[in-house]
Amino acid sequence: MRWAIAMSAETLAVRVRGLVKSYGSVRAVRGIDLDIRPGEIFALLGPNGAGKTTTVEILEGYRRRDGGEVSVLGYDPGRDRAKIKPRVGIVLQQTGVDRYLTVSETVQMYASYYPRPRSPDEVIDLVGLGAKRDSRVTTLSGGQIRRLDMAIALAGDPDLLFLDEPTTGFDPSARREAWEVVKNLASLGKTVLLTTHYMDEAQYLADRVAVIAAGRIVAEGPPATLGDRDHAAARIRYRLPDGAIAPSGLTDAPDGNGFVQVASKDVVADLNRLTGWALANSVTLDGLEVTRPSLEDVYLSITGETDASLPGGEPRTRCG
């Protein structure tokens, strides 16, 4: 049995059991368990003060834990940080680089710190800065500097990459470009631990997400099934012509924008009934749409329910 437990820790990129950390009388982390598989993008979500930063800093080896077991790439970051450091890349929210070096000089400098670095030119191309290779950092845009931060983190060819709010302050186009860079990393077999406040970012990038609130993991699973959102009632929304009355059971109170909406547990049957009625009565259903709760809806619901129930224990939701 002990052999099986040891093997599971070695074969996971990150394994956490019963992680605890306090600051004086404040319990920042209260018994967290996490498994992150090699090659996956894992997003850690949670409100400010929930314990995300403390948890990540413990995994990175920058903060000591009070209790629990932590394995990162098969090592304890509290004892073996020197062994982990060459295999880990970190992209912080804010980093400082010499603004008068070129992009190429910057990446080459950081690559020289590692025993087996990735080719600087390859890293620069990977993050989409090939055209800026010989440009000085001072001439780069905010989004390009963020790409450079990522190139620096990749210079040592890490197995595990920590991304802390990687697209904060980006415009929509730059965010999409950054997402593709992260996707490329996963395609190379890199493991990525992402912290973000953007739910669409987690939805697009993450294979699995965990929601942390008040120091505990309160939900975990693929974005599509987190909090059973795939089984939640769908919302059918449409606009009726003046004077038209929809079939009973397929109309709720108007939403205030001239649309009617109804919660549906059987979308196919309800849509068939609604559209059949509309065809039979020559009624146009303007703006007809069907939606399910978004990841943001589920996240707000989960964290709201958790905040209301603390400090008592809350169930942990596992999905997939």
Place the predicted regions along the sequence by residue.
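Conserved ABC transporter NBD signature motif
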Residues: 68-76, 84
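Conserved catalytic motifs of ABC-family nucleotide-binding domains
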Residues: 157
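Catalytic Walker B motif of ABC-type/P-loop ATPase nucleotide-binding domains
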Residues: 161-165
